[in-house]
């Protein structure tokens, strides 16, 4: 790799890590809101759901709060609160219900149900693709601006995937709603 590019990357993240994190999380929350609104557009029966409306408001407030935050750690806390609320209504976005694909709670290590397994698997694919793309252009995928450095973790890839996680979520919702994935898959 190019050591000069790596030094520039580190300097940039030290100088602008907070702003980059603010922009990434604001975009993530905005994209989550768009995913929910798209589902509401396609499913009139969900439009008056108070919990869904509350989550839309929490995500909107989250956008404002990340720009008021004074540290990356504070933003991580805001993101955790918004994610918990977002996933509290995720099962409602899966409109073609099947017993095998009931979603209750986001679990990761390990995923405890088929929906969480799908989410984790496709997030991993997206993160690996992002890491490969970063390395292709000479960036160090292990040096990020939001995710803390940890041996073996592509922190920058994780940072950049945050903004597009809703694409993975929409893909999983579509797989389930169109019955592309079944219980035997």
Q: What are these language model-derived features?
A:
Residues 3-185:
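Active-site helix-to-loop segments that bind/position phosphate- or nucleotide-bearing substrates
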């Amino acid at each position: 790799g190019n050591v000069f590019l790596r030094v520039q990357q580190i300097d940039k993240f030290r100088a602008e890590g907070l702003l980059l994190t603010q922009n990434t999380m604001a975009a993530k929350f905005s994209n989550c809101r768009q995913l929910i609104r798209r589902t509401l557009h396609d499913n009139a029966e969900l439009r008056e759901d108070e919990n869904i409306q509350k989550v839309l408001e929490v995500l909107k407030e989250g956008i404002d709060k990340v720009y008021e935050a004074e540290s990356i750690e504070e933003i991580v806390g805001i993101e955790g609160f918004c994610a918990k609320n977002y996933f509290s209504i995720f099962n409602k976005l899966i409109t073609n219900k099947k017993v095998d694909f009931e979603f209750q709670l986001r679990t990761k290590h390990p995923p405890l149900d088929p929906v969480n397994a799908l989410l984790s698997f496709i997030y991993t694919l997206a993160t690996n693709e992002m890491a490969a793309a970063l390395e292709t252009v000479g960036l160090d995928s292990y040096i990020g601006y939001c995710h803390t450095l940890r041996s073996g973790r592509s922190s920058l890839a994780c940072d950049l995937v945050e903004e597009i996680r809703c694409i993975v979520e929409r893909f999983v919702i579509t797989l389930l709603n169109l019955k592309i994935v079944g219980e035997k898959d």
